[in-house]
Amino acid sequence: MGDVIVSISDFRVSNNVGDILVTYALGSCIAVAIYDPKVKVGGLLHYMLPDSSLDVDKAKTTPGMFADTGIPLLFKACYSLGAQKKSMIVKVAGGASILDDTNFFRIGQKNIMMARKMFWKNNVLINGEDTGSNCNRTVRLEIKTGKVFVKSSGGPLREL
């Protein structure tokens, strides 16, 4: 019970109404929060890179590092706790341009586009989004309510 920390390149799921899934220091990374209100099951993924083809070996050992391997695993883990795709509420945050002032690598932008592409291809609606800009974010998912809160560096905690 309480805060369950989701590290970079990892995900957590829960059906414990006392849990709050939290991930910190989202820069160019993306947090994907999913929640099924019918069964009160939620999950939070903190991925770093858009595409596992960048490092196939790493994707095998750390699938949460990549959007294309982490997002499907997040959904499957929630399904194993009774969640259903048709009931899922999906919220996305992150994808900032923190250390890339010239916007040369555009990792944040590529991460955002991969999430949108994957959800679109799988007929999943993104219900809330706080992406881009140049600020770090913290994301919290309350399992009891399904509410997702985002705190940008220097800003207040607000519901997404």
Curated annotation (Swiss-Prot):
HAMAP family: CheD. This is Probable chemoreceptor glutamine deamidase CheD 1. GO terms for molecular function: protein-glutamine glutaminase activity. Keywords: Chemotaxis, Hydrolase. Its EC number is 3.5.1.44. PANTHER family: CHEMORECEPTOR GLUTAMINE DEAMIDASE CHED-RELATED. It comes from Syntrophus aciditrophicus (strain SB). Probably deamidates glutamine residues to glutamate on methyl-accepting chemotaxis receptors (MCPs), playing an important role in chemotaxis. The keyword Glycosyltransferase does not apply. It catalyses: L-glutaminyl-[protein] + H2O = L-glutamyl-[protein] + NH4(+). It is an enzyme of class 3 (hydrolase). The gene is cheD1. The keyword Phosphoprotein does not apply. Belongs to the CheD family. It holds the Pfam family CheD. GO terms for biological process: chemotaxis.
